[in-house]
């Protein structure tokens, strides 16, 4: 599960993704929004770092998702079923979503680490399509190098500098 942010701007991130990942971002964003809109503390994926980073900032994730949908529409990728699900979810839960900008997004160091690791991982997924992200491999700085299996991404929810700013589930 991931929300790819190879660039700070949501629309630029959407434009950078290949069709497969672009379409998947719409689905994964919906899944994250659904988890965040569910009060069940045992809900699947509730503690995944991709979910935690958007907790309390669901409105920003909605804007990210809409940037993905807009780009998919430009490319002629069908989004009608996804939009139906998203619209229904927003109608039910949108009033409870937080719309402020996440602290990690406002921090240039955190955002640079996040976008660089996303570029590096996109490159490894499809080196031909993402050839322009090659340089990110050398400067990628994921978190948790001490883990048995280190993270491939920089997760703001794992970073002590930002973990306290990531809202926790009630």
Regions found by a protein language model. Give the residues of each.
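Expand to "…catalyze enediolate/carbanion chemistry for C-C bond making/breaking, isomerization
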Residues: 1-166
């Amino acid at each position: 599960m991931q929300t790819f942010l190879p660039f700070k701007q949501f629309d630029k991130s959407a434009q950078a993704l290949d069709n497969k990942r672009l379409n998947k971002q719409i689905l994964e964003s919906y899944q994250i929004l659904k988890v965040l809109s569910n009060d069940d503390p045992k809900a699947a994926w509730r503690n995944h770092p991709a979910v935690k980073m958007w907790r309390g900032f669901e409105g920003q994730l909605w804007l990210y998702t809409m940037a993905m949908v807009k780009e998919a529409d430009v490319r002629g990728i069908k989004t009608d079923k996804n939009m139906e699900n998203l619209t229904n979810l927003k109608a039910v839960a949108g009033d409870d979503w937080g719309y402020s900008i996440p602290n990690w997004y406002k921090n240039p160091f955190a955002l640079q680490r996040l976008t660089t690791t996303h570029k590096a991982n996109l490159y490894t997924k499809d080196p031909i399509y993402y050839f322009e992200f090659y340089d990110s491999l050398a400067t990628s700085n994921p978190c948790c190098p001490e883990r048995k299996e280190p993270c491939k991404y920089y997760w703001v929810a794992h970073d002590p500098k930002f973990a306290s700013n990531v809202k926790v589930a009630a």
